[in-house]
Amino acid sequence: MVVVTIFTTACNINRPPGQDVPAVTSDTLHVEKVDNLPEDFILGMDTSCVPALEACGVKYYDHDGEETDVYEILSRNGINYIRVRVWNDPYDSQGNGYGGGNCDIENAIAIGKRATKYGMKLLVDFHFSDFWADPGKQMIPIVWQNMDYDKKRESLYAYTRDQLQMLIDAGVDVGMVQIGNETNGAFCGESSSVPGGWKRIMELISAGSKAVREICPEALVAVHFTNPENVDSYFSYGKNLEYYQVDYDVFASSYYPYWHGTLDNLAQVLSDIAQRYGKKVMVAETSYAYTAADSDFFANTIGEGGNVNNYPFTQQGQASLVRDVIDTLANRTTGGIGVFYWEGTWISAGGDDWEQNYALWEKYGSGWASSYAAEYDPDDAGRWYGGCAVDNQAFFDANGYALESLKVFRLVREGNIVENSPNAF
């Protein structure tokens, strides 16, 4: 993430304090070494739903079949950074969770403490919304809805400051803070499509950045966009950040290969940002399927026929895609500092049928949205609530056992050549 000193702890990858970590080997997974991979290169994973899944009874198992803390499993296999989303107040007026992990600050603290225990830094992803913020919606938190703009900006600053202080007080190793999630022309109820919209968006981002600098002066500040295939839009984001003098370190992009174009384009777009504005760049979200099958009785984002050329829906295909994204950021992108995999631990809640899983999603918030989210987001979550849509893109099977493909995060550093590697395992 830029400055080497910031990564001193993070680069002690796969080695929780006081523990030796055995080498990772594989007889079936073919991984070409990523040359010139810096020791402090970020190999991260979003795990925001883990506590909700564990509340449902989900357990995680290492490659020897032993039940193990999932954060220890991730650390052993090369993950050196954990990402967690934070929503302002993801509960309805009766205290029922909206789902998607019910990702409030308490959830972030619980995850952050476990990540820190196993030698991993935390990226805090503030959505500045009560539920999902993405290119389709950037809804303002309910408690800010009746505020004028100046009061909202002040509240965003104070909220960011106070939430970060809670994480620091809990002993969490915060390495990076993301101000907004996939803020493509909108943020916290503001839109670039109206006069003065960009100015307001950038001032709000600056308010969040100011809080980070005060509470976590050594942490990196990241901004996050998506759809890198829309090259002109990325140039617009970069120009506006520069014009309004936003204080940030990292320009982050989502990259889902089945939506977002080629790796060549990704490298070119991010390199241009890095060269023009002197910023670090990274992939904040990526993922790929190891199977076309669904395991929780709720339709997946991608399935049969959705694969990208050269990457079959197998564990080998999943690992190869991840390896190539890492290589693209490390060797073909100016200023590339890392890659985060999105929700590689989000698996089935464990029910034997849809009805059992639905009850778990509603009670513990382990699906993408509960029916209670309709109070806040009636048009999307209120219509399509349900389970996990990415369980076939996790690094654990439906029963919580680590896949062979998870080893890719370790094997990219040394390589693991398997002749005639099967694409079907």
Label for each model-derived stretch:
Residues D64, T68-Y71, E214-L220, D232-V308, ...:
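Glycoside hydrolase catalytic-domain groove-lining segments
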Residues M45, L74, A115, D125, ...:
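Conserved, mostly hydrophobic/aromatic
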Residues N12-N14:
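Bacterial signal peptide processing site
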Residues S48-V50, W87-D89, H127-F131, I179-N184, ...:
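Active-site beta-loop-alpha junctions enriched in small/polar residues
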Residues L29, K33, D272, T291-N307, ...:
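Aromatic-rich peripheral "rim/lid" segments of glycoside hydrolase catalytic domains that contact
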Residues F7-A10:
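C-terminal motif of bacterial Sec signal peptides marking the signal peptidase cleavage site
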Residues G97-Y98, N102-I109, A133-N240, V246, ...:
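Active-site cleft segment of glycoside hydrolase catalytic domains centered on the general acid/base Glu
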Residues V21-A110, R114-K121, H127-S155, A252, ...:
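N-terminal substrate-binding region of glycoside hydrolase catalytic domains
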